[in-house]
Amino acid sequence: MRIFFWKAAVAAVAGLGAAVQAQPFYLPTANHALFVKGGEPDFFAPTPGKTWESGCFGCVRTDRHQMHEGLDIKCLQRDSRGEPTDPVMAAAAGVVEYINDRPALSNYGRYMVLGHNIGGVEVYSLYAHLHSVRSDLKAGVSVQAGEPIAVMGRTSNTAETISQERAHVHFELNLFYSDHFAAWFKTHFPGERNDHGVWNGENLVGFDPRLVFLEERAEGTNFNLTTWLQHRVELCRVLVRKTNAPWVKRYPMLVAQNPTAQKEGVAGYEISLDYNGLPFAWVPRAASEIKGALKYRLLSVNEAEETLNPCRNMVKQVSGRWQLAPNGISLLDLLTE
């Protein structure tokens, strides 16, 4: 069973009381050009030959067919050799969950994951392409919001290295899919290595930090992460005949009440997925509310959203009818196994 280090973080800062629950996210570097009108080119590090949008979160690469699950934030400081020296800071109070100190094992290069409790929501921030991680940090160590945790770099294991000009920190905000990831990975990627256990990026589902930062700045202390997550745009809705989904216990704030299922018992769930595969709304269903015997059934597709953000390939059209694509089925397996 995985130890939830983020719970230790909550205890460590319990003296802050309600302030912990209202803790906003902070930008992970001193680059605050995101908050300057027209400052996006100074904030986002684009891919070679592309505009700043390619450094954003979303279907922003390869003509909208490749997902980029974070923000690439430009460096501000360099040493005499032109290498980045920007401190990377914790985006919120939390606990170190994982450090990969072997850049060759991931296209993230050297990266680390912090766990946070934001108003009761279990959130994980990820910082990648790091030059170095603070030497005293290891899994289980608490950090405060804005505390330096690493130095920006350009580490990676990809064939095309990150140039000095493009030096950046890749930053993500994520929810956590499943403690059963290792078994799922072995089934769906036979023969492939998983060097990072549950902290493999495939087991973290991102939401757009840019939108969070901007809305948080606009709303101040009125910003509520749960409400924000509950109002994601639906790409598709599916019905699953499974009742043991770990997500339901980890994120109960995203599960609706259904009197019929409460009375008769839960036989499955109706799940709303955004375009990145984040299951932001779950409705328990009783057996009397479920038609057919299929394990998974696609209920609806938001065609406008699928056209705008097709990069996850979770659904497909066959002879004019929408179906779950292999990627969509694989995701549902991860959520419900």
Summary of predicted features, one role per range:
Residues 1-9:
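Bacterial N-terminal signal peptides that target proteins for export
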Residues 78, 99-102, 132, 154-158:
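Short beta-turn/strand-loop junction motif enriched in small, turn-promoting residues
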Residues 91, 137-143:
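Short, well-ordered loop/turn sites that connect or cap secondary structure elements
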Residues 10-15:
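Hydrophobic helical h-region of N-terminal Sec-dependent signal peptides
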Residues 17-19:
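N-terminal signal peptide c-region/cleavage motif recognized by signal peptidases
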Residues 106, 111-114, 141-218:
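Conserved, short, structured surface segments that act as functional micro-motifs
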Residues 22-110, 195-337:
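Surface-exposed, glycine-biased beta-strand/turn segments
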Residues 83-85, 91-134, 164-168:
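Zn2+-dependent peptidoglycan hydrolase active-site motif and core
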